[in-house]
Amino acid sequence: MIRSRSVLLIFRKVLYQSSCLKCLLCANSFSTSVSSSLGFRATNKELNQMIRSGYIAEARDIFEKLEARNTVTWNTMISGYVKRREMNQARKLFDVMPKRDVVTWNTMISGYVSCGGIRFLEEARKLFDEMPSRDSFSWNTMISGYAKNRRIGEALLLFEKMPERNAVSWSAMITGFCQNGEVDSAVVLFRKMPVKDSSPLCALVAGLIKNERLSEAAWVLGQYGSLVSGREDLVYAYNTLIVGYGQRGQVEAARCLFDQIPDLCGDDHGGEFRERFCKNVVSWNSMIKAYLKVGDVVSARLLFDQMKDRDTISWNTMIDGYVHVSRMEDAFALFSEMPNRDAHSWNMMVSGYASVGNVELARHYFEKTPEKHTVSWNSIIAAYEKNKDYKEAVDLFIRMNIEGEKPDPHTLTSLLSASTGLVNLRLGMQMHQIVVKTVIPDVPVHNALITMYSRCGEIMESRRIFDEMKLKREVITWNAMIGGYAFHGNASEALNLFGSMKSNGIYPSHITFVSVLNACAHAGLVDEAKAQFVSMMSVYKIEPQMEHYSSLVNVTSGQGQFEEAMYIITSMPFEPDKTVWGALLDACRIYNNVGLAHVAAEAMSRLEPESSTPYVLLYNMYADMGLWDEASQVRMNMESKRIKKERGSSWVDSST
């Protein structure tokens, strides 16, 4: 007996520490042979541990080979299937189980309810009605199930029939009312409670907040907070309201509530209520998040420094706050002090350095990340994509697949953007196949597909995807398709689609008008462009940005209307950038407008003194006109300033 127990312990160690399947099966075989000698408790414990470790098939094999099973053995196996939502397997065992107890019935009922949907709820109700005896868990599970499925009337009927209600029953019913928008009924029900408890109070406060009734939530908390039983749990209601205020930017109200909670349990505030009610780590974390929500990093850090007990969330929240305001030195300092880092800590450093353009440091932290998850890969792939290093983004995706990590919608969106940047139709189509095979119903992914196909020359495929999206279209979807037509110079389709967008009640954004104005520029539709520009400001109240002015200069100067173009430039509410002057200079070359070309070139040189673009454009304009002396002078000026010609630009050969 002692020998068998010792050997079984060794095999158990192998079972839970080894990844060798042969060792696992060997341990299973041995466990079966000695289960009777060790009793049900050891066997059930082993089954449970195997199921928790993900070896449910092997656990079932042991279960089938056992010479004897008790109710707990059956319940353990059924519970394993329920947790994996394999309700068919669980039901088969349930139906042949020789003797069930209330735990068996409750496990099946909660499993059906957790699966969601009316069909599973009806199965749960059938079992509930067949139960020989019910406990409060049985009733509460069914009440919650009906409430979550918007059948609040049936939930209330069960609640009223319930022989003995507890705090969970009242909480379930209050939560159900709030989830279904019947907030007043929730308040009335809470007031009917014979003995107020902190759990239903927390449920009511949370429900009021979700229904945007924060002032009422604060009143309820103030009115009943000192009267409820279970006062040590009252802090959860306060924390919920602090989070509610914080999410809505009401940081002063959040801080006022935070300060009402005693710092320490058992301080000298007096009374039993105060002794059992104090701030916990969630209170501090919630208040720090509230400050960071409004960008008050200083107040958040002061509070963080006052914390006596911090958890990983505390550190990550503060680091994330620094990352969001691009204070990477502070983020690095805090990260270096952090005692226990998790995957999120490392991912924040990767995305943080990427957001400030330091891809090298982002890559450094990525490579040092102990356990790389999908989010880790997404962060570094997105970093290279945003930095326009599309090839490295693709190489990382290939490595991600080799290392066995599956892509998600964020991965595919970045890769589709990389395909667009590389103008690589084949790569984009491969990404599209992954989307189809994984059946990812993600709007941003499909938006990226529309852009990718249009930029790679397959505008018809873009339109096919756009048409298939139908009711799932958002403003970005319309922008992508209109932008695709504009990119291809198809102004009529772009403008027609813009009209459909408005008739479908989709409010255009500033990006929409950039695409519309670009479409007008491609087609030389000056009057249409002016009308759309005016409409953008007067009808949609969108303030013109640099891109809009650049497009308007492009369309007017492109049609030889240089006075109009200069009027637009001089009347802009901000200094024109290189895109504006570049559009004018391009038009000057087409129309041989030497005087205005000099103005545009000089303006571009002031903005980017080391750029060769204005010199090359000016040189080529003189060359086109046969003015070789002037062209040579431009080249000499450029060489005297030691400006090197950028890759991709070329001189017109003087020998031709």
From Swiss-Prot:
Organism: Arabidopsis thaliana
InterPro entries registered for this protein in UniProt: E_motif, Pentatricopeptide_rpt, PPR_At4g14850-like_plant, TPR-like_helical_dom_sf
Key word Repeat present: yes
Keyword Oxidoreductase: no
Gene3D superfamilies reported for this sequence: Tetratricopeptide repeat domain
Gene: PCMP-E10
PPR repeat residue intervals: 70-104, 105-134, 135-169, 170-200, 203-227, 234-264, 280-310, 311-345, 346-372, 373-407, 408-438, 442-472, 474-508, 509-544, 545-575
Entry-linked Pfam families: E_motif, PPR, PPR_1, PPR_2
GO biological process: cytidine to uridine editing
Chief site of localization: mitochondrion
Top-level taxon in the UniProt lineage: Eukaryota
Protein name: Pentatricopeptide repeat-containing protein At1g62260, mitochondrial
A GO MF term: RNA binding
GO terms under cellular component: mitochondrion
Coiled-coil residue windows: none
Bilayer-spanning residue ranges: none
Taxonomic lineage from the root: Eukaryota, Viridiplantae, Streptophyta, Embryophyta, Tracheophyta
Sequence segments annotated as region (Type E motif): 580-655
Keywords, comma-separated and alphabetical: Mitochondrion, Repeat, Transit peptide
Similarity comment text for this entry: Belongs to the PPR family. PCMP-E subfamily.
Location(s), subcellular: Mitochondrion
